[in-house]
UniProtKB/Swiss-Prot annotation:
It holds the Pfam family CCDC144C. This is Ankyrin repeat domain-containing protein 30B. Disulfide bonds: none annotated. Residues 636-650, 864-874, 904-915 have a biased composition (Basic and acidic residues). SMART domains: ANK. Residues 960-1168, 1270-1318 form a coiled coil. Residues 1-21, 265-292, 558-587, 636-656, 671-690, 830-877, 904-926 are annotated as: Disordered.
Amino acid sequence: MKRLLAAAGKGVRGPEPPNPFSERVYTEKDYGTIYFGDLGKIHTAASRGQVQKLEKMTVGKKPVNLNKRDMKKRTALHWACVNGHAEVVTFLVDRKCQLNVLDGEGRTPLMKALQCEREACANILIDAGADLNYVDVYGNTALHYAVYSENLLMVATLLSYGAVIEVQNKASLTPLLLAIQKRSKQTVEFLLTKNANANAFNESKCTALMLAICEGSSEIVGMLLQQNVDVFAEDIHGITAERYAAACGVNYIHQQLLEHIRKLPKNPQNTNPEGTSTGTPDEAAPLAERTPDTAESLLEKTPDEAARLVEGTSAKIQCLGKATSGKFEQSTEETPRKILRPTKETSEKFSWPAKERSRKITWEEKETSVKTECVAGVTPNKTEVLEKGTSNMIACPTKETSTKASTNVDVSSVEPIFSLFGTRTIENSQCTKVEEDFNLATKIISKSAAQNYTCLPDATYQKDIKTINHKIEDQMFPSESKREEDEEYSWDSGSLFESSAKTQVCIPESMYQKVMEINREVEELPEKPSAFKPAVEMQKTVPNKAFELKNEQTLRAAQMFPSESKQKDDEENSWDSESPCETVSQKDVYLPKATHQKEFDTLSGKLEESPVKDGLLKPTCGRKVSLPNKALELKDRETFKAESPDKDGLLKPTCGRKVSLPNKALELKDRETLKAESPDNDGLLKPTCGRKVSLPNKALELKDRETFKAAQMFPSESKQKDDEENSWDFESFLETLLQNDVCLPKATHQKEFDTLSGKLEESPDKDGLLKPTCGMKISLPNKALELKDRETFKAEDVSSVESTFSLFGKPTTENSQSTKVEEDFNLTTKEGATKTVTGQQERDIGIIERAPQDQTNKMPTSELGRKEDTKSTSDSEIISVSDTQNYECLPEATYQKEIKTTNGKIEESPEKPSHFEPATEMQNSVPNKGLEWKNKQTLRADSTTLSKILDALPSCERGRELKKDNCEQITAKMEQTKNKFCVLQKELSEAKEIKSQLENQKAKWEQELCSVRLTLNQEEEKRRNVDILKEKIRPEEQLRKKLEVKQQLEQTLRIQDIELKSVTSNLNQVSHTHESENDLFHENCMLKKEIAMLKLEVATLKHQHQVKENKYFEDIKILQEKNAELQMTLKLKQKTVTKRASQYREQLKVLTAENTMLTSKLKEKQDKEILETEIESHHPRLASALQDHDQSVTSRKNQELAFHSAGDAPLQGIMNVDVSNTIYNNEVLHQPLYEAQRKSKSPKINLNYAGDDLRENALVSEHAQRDRCETQCQMKKAEHMYQNEQDNVDKHTEQQESLEQKLFQLESKNRWLRQQLVYAHKKVNKSKVTINIQFPEMKMQRHLNEKNEEVFNYGNHLKERIDQYEKEKAEREVSIKKYKYFSNFLKESGLG
């Protein structure tokens, strides 16, 4: 509670300090001090819960005011609620005391009950109708106190009775915000279900989400995020919820917020309720300042999501840079921007106690700069505004270019330039046709490329940047104007890395590649008139989820002088362009800070600007960076124009080429067109050089092509042989490129790039007659790399060229021959590409080199055309490397060294005058798990190279046939993709139709809503009009009532005047009745005394009746409880009786069965007795038989002796017969004896069994008798209880009869009093002696009438009570009948 008061009551004085001499009593939950001296009797009684004392105070002669207040304006109801005496609260509410009284702190009794967690008291007050929306001194309502005490039931009851949920206290805390501070999850969830405002904020504009983050409750944060709260809202200091999470160190909540932000719609707007200014001149500021580290959150998303975010902004060019570099490319001006970032302090600052939750947040300022450069390049038919910026910048599409940027395959922006007679050149027609094919191929192959990060320590990051920037050397220019022009076109690589952080830098893979690219600087030379004005344009596209780099460069050759010293100066000042890019694996590559910074410095440091001299060509360089649907396109175009001094703009041939890459490949194609014209009006050479370096997704392939300079052609045969020796060698090139992969550490990789790009130099140009053009178009179809190389050597006399174009408008024979050679070469290169390339190519790194240009002498056109067929052989090769899924982490030091050493071998051959100046093309690829560096060194003029080239030509012819088959397969795939595209178009059209239907429905619904709103507004207006009419009618009604009252008073006054007149007239008549008046006066006094006595009796009777009623109520409650108990016992007894009856029945059955058994046993006994008698009868017979047997034995012995003595044989035989007879007789006699013994044993056993059964039956019968006795006792008890209840009923009836008698007496008294009043009225009407007597009599009459009404009402109340008693009697009789029925049932069951 202290926190609530401290938060809400700023500046409010607390309670006064207690007096040390007074007795102090503290309540349980009230934080004030109580003084008994300040309290009244009613307050002490209420605080102690003494209800009877309060009753005596209110009923006595001097009733106490229930709303009396103490010294601090607290009533008895306040004290009862604080101490939780619900009986006192009910008593006070029944006595109709004030429920919404405010104490000294503006709190109602309901607030005090909720503050002290007295639920019973609060429920009583709410049911009685206490106001729930009163506000105390601190702005808290009853709902605030319920939320603070974390009592969910009270919160629910308050809201169900209509408490306002959005009230703010003086600290601007709603109940929801207070619940969040208390970390009570259940109350927060309940308030949110009751539609509490989840976007509420306190006085410092901290939202509910921010408070939940500071409290560290992830569950409450999850609840708020489900309510779609404003995640991007800011407090007074501009800090968002995300930054609160970062500053408080709550990582899991921070991750939860980031996941929610990613799930938000793709084009979020600033949802800050207060609103932020978006009208700054820097259009990227809303995106950058909306959330902390917005650039990082943008770059962490996929390219598709980043593109959608950027597309939602204004149509101006808006650019977002990387958060680590802090650079945003926009208009040419540079505006610094401050972004506050939260930084974690030490662990000691963040360790705080859980109760206080005080957190310290510090913010450090970081500056980011915004810088862009725009260059306008003007072509004959079109002006294009191209944006140029650093390699790690992202440019947003303008209104003009947004449609182009959103497509997967960009269409070439070069418009065809027609000749004088409206015919297009052969080269242009061929280029546009090939571009269409490549557009289709890239549509087929387009796939989504995942964006990975490279985590680099900051030290490494800065070192690389420094080493790059240190090698950028600016040479002196002849004029300041030229210097300014070149500075406009130069890349600002130094400003890229100003805001690198000291901690690790997480760089997306695509951004890391861009940072490693070299900033190119282009010279601008003064224009001179020339015979030709070609414009070369190159467009490179990367499909969905890939970088699309379009780079067109046209390099102009300065006018050369014949002196060798001049040639050396030009060689030293030649323009060196290099574009090494570094791809990073899907896994993070961790590099030290030092090595990382060195890489950047060494790369950008090699950019050198050559001095601007008088020349014939004027290059215009422009770069355009756009964000398509899911891709980043970089378009770089450079157009170089040269005119002859004599003939201005006769011919304008245009060469446009397009190179496309599949979905997961980055292709860099760089074309350089070198145009040179001699100061004379003779035909000038315009050589063109195109080179390509491609890297697959998981392999870096380096394909290097080098073209070697041909010696100056003379009519002699020796010079022709030299030129043949300088041709390219196919066989050696294939042998070197088809070797195994070379896995190099990362450091070696970096060094090789540095040395390669560092040693590329430009040879000086001299006067010549021929115009060789070399163009290359390379496409990567479905996981294959196609290499198309076209080289056309053109040598024309200026006069002949002008004549052919001006007169006939047709291309020359040399052009036709060159196109034929180009077709042958394309077939060979396609064949080689389909054989070798199997790996998946995802990213390309282009390294641009410029081959030296040789000075050529004038020669006839015919001779040059003949020699072109023999000498324009080229060598192309593609190395396929199987893709692997992981990159190797390579050290930076070895990486840079190896690249420097390999590039060191690439040197320019000495320049010689020649009629041909072929262009070179180089393609380098590096595999995924290693660095495959295959470099083709310059071939010197040898006879051995010619033989190898001639041997390689048949293999090219064989490759053509294979390439045709591959082309057919590709065309079939193209048709399938076209069909798929048609199906998708149909689905899109259907989706658009559905969208249009939904929009129509939405419009209809909006119209309906508007109509409903109008009707609601009309109804509200009608209600307001009715209320206004009621307010107008109210005073009229009051006036009418007042007039009626006045009329009634006037009538009464008239009547009184008439009576006075009658009384005055009767004064004379009543003068003789003075004695009777005195009697009447005495009688009045007696009546007054009697009335007072009656009042006392009525009061005593009321009190007695109340006491009796309370006693009766208590007795009735007790009887009801007893009846309930009896009913329960009866039910239990019924159950037991039924159980016992069933048991008894079973026992009876058993007994009957036993009786039958016993009867059978008795019969057996009788049989046994008969057998015993028979046995006894057999005993004498046995004795006699034994005697006979003994006698026979003795006789036998005697006879034997006699026979022995006599020895007569016949006598022995006779004796044997006699013995056998006697033996037989004995056996016959023994058999009945055995039978008799057996029969005698069986009845004895049966008798034993029968005795046991009888004993068991006796025990069972004893138990049954005991149970019967118990049931009889219970029946007696029930009868006794019934008799007691009957006695109580009789008592109640007697009491009711006595009450009726008393009521009858009271009624009789009332009648007598009425008679007396009537009699007194009659007397008063008769006498009417004086006015002084009349008015008191009227008052007495009224008083008596009121008393009579009260007595009558009391009688009615008693009658109602009697009716209630009668109803209760009937209920009791019914219960008694039930008892009787159950008792009878028990008796019957006991008897049965």
